Amino acid sequence: FSGAPEEFDAKSALLREHTIAVGTDFDAIVRSSNYNTVIGATEAEVADRIDAIEARVAPFLGKRTEGFMREYRSGTALCVGTPEQVVERLSDMKARGLGYAINYFPEAAYDRSGMDLFAREVIPALS
C-alpha cells in the first residue's frame, strides 16, 4: 500500500471491494505501508540529517540527487520530522486502518540515533 493517506484510502476501498467479491473478511487483512524515515528531536535536526543524507548520496547519484531527495524535502513525507509530527501522522494512518509501518532509515549505516529516537518516542506513543 502507498504511504500517502489518500492513496491508502483508495487502495483500501478497492481491497474492500475485492474481498466482498470473493467472500473474504476485509478486517482479517493486515494493511501495511513502507516509509522512508528521518527523525530528529527538532526540525533543525531533521534538516541537518536530510542534508547529511544528500551529501552521502550526491557523489553517486549526480544529477539524480534532487529527484532522490525530493520526498525527504517535500513536507508531505509522513515519517520525516520530529517525533511529535511522526506520531501525529502515523496515528492518522492507524485510524485509516494501517496495521503496521515498514520503516526504512536511510542513515542507519552511519548513525543509529534516529532509529533510537523512533524506538524511544514514536513506537510507545503508537502502541
Regions found by a protein language model. Give the residues of each.
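Active-site-adjacent structural elements that line small-molecule/cofactor binding pockets in enzymes
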Residues: 1-127
